[in-house]
């Protein structure tokens, strides 16, 4: 059983610095590693002892390393048997007294979590773009079938229920592509903080693609259920997208907690001001006015679209 998944801080793999400080010695293992059976270079996250410069206390913190199989001590298990993405080589990787040069630390010692988040953000962003292609392929298959298939003397495309399914598929595709372009635009402009957008894009894309593939099979009926059509494979392959790169459940918690944290920071000065409200009317009044406007359905800032009901 895995010791860590969504809980990245529970990593057990360790890397201890050598006595002369020239390298780290890595021991432990990782499971479910993509390309683990033949990869020559790995990005490995491991617990390392880090001394706090202020207190002098030593604590374990995650550090990212670039590990090469040629270092020695790197082995792997047999490929895993999976529900989907079977063409992807997924295997356990084991590390036994692997000597990693100190120059192979990614970022800084103890800064592995930041590196992991950067990698995950990129992966989540790319998911929206990749799954847009999957959805488009499914929509084409469902549409072609609806145009050609005749039942009860009518083409499937002429039934309102089928039209609704096709419309729903295209709506989700459009939204997924729009989110992918938005996140890509933020990245191109050099934005450093796009983790919320990447998380939301990953959730929406993975769940929309699953829905579109499922509805495609439904439109095709028995034909879609057969392996020859290929959509059962698409559905199996899509299931992992709601799990890896951060499960959708964890990402929902992340989005909610980040939003609450942001609101908490906004309310912090108000909390302090309320201890002496008459002396801090300048701080309290704008917030109170904004809350009153919200209750009345008025925008917080000027808008041409608002009109009293």
Segment roles from a protein language model:
Residues 1-2, 10-12, 27-30, 195:
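Cysteine-centered functional microenvironments
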Residues 2, 47, 68-70, 79, ...:
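Structured loops at beta-to-helix junctions and adjacent beta-edge loops in soluble globular domains
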Residues 2-6, 32-35, 55-56, 82-89:
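Short Gly/Pro-enriched turn/cap motifs at secondary-structure boundaries
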Residues 9-11, 40, 72, 162:
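Short beta-strand or tight-loop elements
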Residues 10, 16-23, 59-64, 87-94, ...:
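Flavin-dependent oxidoreductase catalytic core characteristic
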Residues 11, 77-80:
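Short structured motifs
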Residues 23-76:
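A short core secondary-structure module
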């Amino acid at each position: 059983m895995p010791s860590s998944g969504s809980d990245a801080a529970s990593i057990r793999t360790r890397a201890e610095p050598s006595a002369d400080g020239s390298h780290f010695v890595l021991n432990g293992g990782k499971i479910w590693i993509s390309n683990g059976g033949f990869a020559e270079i790995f990005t490995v996250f491991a617990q390392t002892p880090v001394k706090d410069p202020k207190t002098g206390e030593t604590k374990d913190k995650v550090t990212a390393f670039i590990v090469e199989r040629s270092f020695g001590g790197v082995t792997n298990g047999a490929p895993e048997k999976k529900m989907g993405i079977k063409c992807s080589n997924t295997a356990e990787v084991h590390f036994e007294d692997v000597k990693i040069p100190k120059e192979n630390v990614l970022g800084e010692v103890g800064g592995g979590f930041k590196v992991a988040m950067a990698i995950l953000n990129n992966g989540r962003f790319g998911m929206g773009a990749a799954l847009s292609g999957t959805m488009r392929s499914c929509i084409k298959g469902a549409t072609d079938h609806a145009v050609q298939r005749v039942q009860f003397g009518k083409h499937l495309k002429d039934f309102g229920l089928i039209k609704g399914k096709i419309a729903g598929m295209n709506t989700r595709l459009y939204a997924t592509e729009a989110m992918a372009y938005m996140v890509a635009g933020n990245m191109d402009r050099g934005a450093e903080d796009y983790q919320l957008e990447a998380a939301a894009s990953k959730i929406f894309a993975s769940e929309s693609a699953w829905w579109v593939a499922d509805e495609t099979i439904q439109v095709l009926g028995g034909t879609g259920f057969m392996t020859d059509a290929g959509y059962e494979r698409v559905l199996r392959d899509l299931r992992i997208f709601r799990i890896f790169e951060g499960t959708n459940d964890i990402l929902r918690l992340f989005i909610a907690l980040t939003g609450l944290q942001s609101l908490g920071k906004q309310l912090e000065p108000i909390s302090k001001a309320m201890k002496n409200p008459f002396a801090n009317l300048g701080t309290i009044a704008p917030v109170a006015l904004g809350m009153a406007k919200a209750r009345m359905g008025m925008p917080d800032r000027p808008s041409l679209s608002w009109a009293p009901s």
